A protein has these predicted regions:
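Active-site substrate-binding loop(s) of clan PA
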Residues: 17-18, 61-62, 93-95, 108-141
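Active-site region of chymotrypsin-like
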Residues: 21-36, 108-116, 143-222
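Catalytic-histidine neighborhood of serine endopeptidases
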Residues: 40, 47-48, 52-100, 111-113
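Short, surface-exposed secondary-structure boundary micro-motifs
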Residues: 54-56, 136, 194
C-alpha cells in the first residue's frame, strides 16, 4: 500500500529532520545504454519494490528505453568513491510510464525493507510554502538537500491536460530529475521534473523549476491499479484528467536517457562532494 499524508502537523520539521526521514527512501538511478553511455537521475521509493521517477530519466525521447536500469540506495554509496561501494546495483524494470506527465513507475528487486515516502495532498499546498528536494545534482554531492518555496501553481502545463505542476525556486540541476519535492512534514508534494534555463531570446532564467503535483501522481497510479491507503481528499477538477489514454505499459527496452538542464546550485545544504559524471559512471557495476 502507498500511504498519503492526510493531516498537517502543528509544527513542521526542520530541514535536517526532513532529510533524515527521507534520505534512505531516495534512490540513485543509473541507466546503461546499448552504445555504452550512461546517465543518471533520482527516484523515490513509494511502495514495496516500487520507485517513482520521471519518464525522461528512463526514456530517450518519448518511448525508447535504456539497455539496463540500476538502482542504488544511500546506504550503499553515500558520497564514497571506493570501488567496493558501487557494486550493489539493483536491477529495475519499467511497469508503466507516461511521457506527457513525465512519470515512470519502476519495479526494483531487493528493496522491500526500504521505507516508503509518504505522499501529501498537493491541493493543500499554497504559494509561499517552504519545500525541500533531495537528489543527485551534477557536480554536487549524491543525496544532496536543497531548499526553496512554492512560487506558483500551474494547471495543464504546456497545454497537457491533467499535468498540474508546482513552480519552485528550490535549486535543481541535472541529476535531480525524478526526485521528491518535500513539504515541511517530510511528505512528497511533487516529483521534480524540469527547469527553465533560457528564454526564447536567449536571456538567462534562474530559479524557475517545476514538479508534477503529488495528486497527479496519485491519480495516475490509481489508473494503473496501484492501491492506496489513507488517501487525502482531492478536488474534483484534478481527478483522472487526461491520463489514461496516454499511459504506456511494459515497453520494449531500447536506449539512453535525457536529464534536466542545469542551474547554479546556490542553496546546497549538505556538505558539497563534487562528482564528475564520467568518473562516477566508471565506478558503478552491477552485482
Amino acid at each position: 500500500l502507498i500511504f498519503f499524508s492526510t493531516l498537517k502537523a502543528y509544527s513542521q520539521m526542520t530541514p535536517r529532520e526532513v532529510y533524515q526521514k527521507n534520505v534512505n527512501s531516495v534512490v540513485l538511478i543509473i541507466t546503461k545504454n546499448k552504445d555504452g553511455s550512461k546517465s543518471k537521475g533520482t527516484g523515490s521509493v513509494i511502495d514495496s519494490s516500487k520507485v517513482i521517477t520521471n519518464a525522461h530519466v528512463v526514456l530517450e525521447g518519448r518511448d525508447q528505453m535504456p539497455d539496463e536500469i540500476l538502482i542504488f540506495l544511500s546506504e550503499d554509496n553515500f558520497n564514497d568513491e571506493s570501488q567496493k561501494n558501487y557494486k550493489k546495483g539493483r536491477s529495475a524494470k519499467i511497469l508503466r510510464y507516461d511521457s506527457d506527465l513525465d512519470l515512470a513507475l519502476l519495479e526494483v528487486k531487493r528493496i522491500k525493507t526500504v521505507p516508503a515516502i509518504g505522499l501529501a495532498d498537493s491541493d493543500q499546498v499554497m504559494v509561499g510554502d517552504p519545500v525541500l528536494a533531495i537528489g543527485h545534482p551534477e557536480s554536487g554531492g549524491l543525496w544532496s538537500l536543497t531548499s526553496g518555496r512554492i512560487g506558483s501553481i500551474i494547471k495543464n502545463q504546456s497545454g497537457i491536460k491533467g499535468k498540474h505542476v508546482f513552480q519552485t525556486e528550490t535549486s535543481l540541476n541535472r541529476g535531480n530529475s525524478g526526485g521528491p519535492l518535500l513539504d515541511g512534514n517530510g511528505d512528497m508534494v511533487g516529483v521534480n521534473t524540469n527547469i527553465s534555463r533560457r528564454s526564447s531570446d536567449g536571456l538567462a532564467i534562474t530559479g524557475i523549476n517545476f514538479a508534477v503535483q503529488s495528486n497527479v501522481l496519485r491519480d495516475w497510479l490509481r489508473m494503473g491499479g496501484i492501491s492506496l491507503a489513507n488517501t487525502a481528499p482531492q478536488k474534483s477538477d484534478q481527478t483522472d484528467v487526461g491520463i489514461k489514454k496516454k499511459e504506456k505499459v511494459n515497453p520494449e527496452p531500447k536506449k539512453q536517457t535525457q536529464e534536466m538542464e542545469s542551474l547554479p546550485d546556490n542553496k546546497l545544504l549538505t556538505p558539497p562532494r563534487p562528482f564528475d559524471d564520467k568518473d562516477l559512471f566508471n565506478l558503478f557495476e552491477d552485482e
